């Protein structure tokens, strides 16, 4: 099966693009979605997170306290590595399981840090980057997450630069406009990927 790695900076529109691909019939595996499942109440990562970080980072409902953890890991590299050491193996296991079950003519794996970690480069045949201006990233990310501009910029600095991301892309979606514009670009790529999938 043809496997596409979909990536992009915070607020670029990765999830919106993935949802359109899914509606067109592509298989979609989203690593952010998996991470949320692992860290919600009853999630498989929580016992290890509780042991490593303490009750302060668990909500009264038993889920990861994302705000507290975000504040910690952006100021403490060791804490970030410790959290990644817990989450990343669990995410990779679940990605492998879902890839094995995937239906559809081709598969999109949504990996925000595809180029930073390199974890999934071995299973993707193409890299699709969703790109947008820095201003669009900041306004979307602050509106969606409730983070302030400073927090969003801190995340952007931790990610590879736009130029570096675009330099590693096989395909690019430019998401500076509206949803119909995004849909047109996704439909064009869907046609391309259907053709490539038939040849693979």
Swiss-Prot record:
EC number(s) stated in the UniProt entry for this protein: 2.7.1.24
GO molecular function annotation: ATP binding; dephospho-CoA kinase activity
Compartments, record wording: Cytoplasm
UniProt cross-references to Pfam families, sorted A to Z: CoaE
SUPFAM superfamilies in the cross-refs: P-loop containing nucleoside triphosphate hydrolases
Chief site of localization: cytoplasm
CDD domains in the record: DPCK
GO biological process terms held by the UniProt record: coenzyme A biosynthetic process
Summary of the function given for this chain in its UniProt record: Catalyzes the phosphorylation of the 3'-hydroxyl group of dephosphocoenzyme A to form coenzyme A.
Protein name: Dephospho-CoA kinase
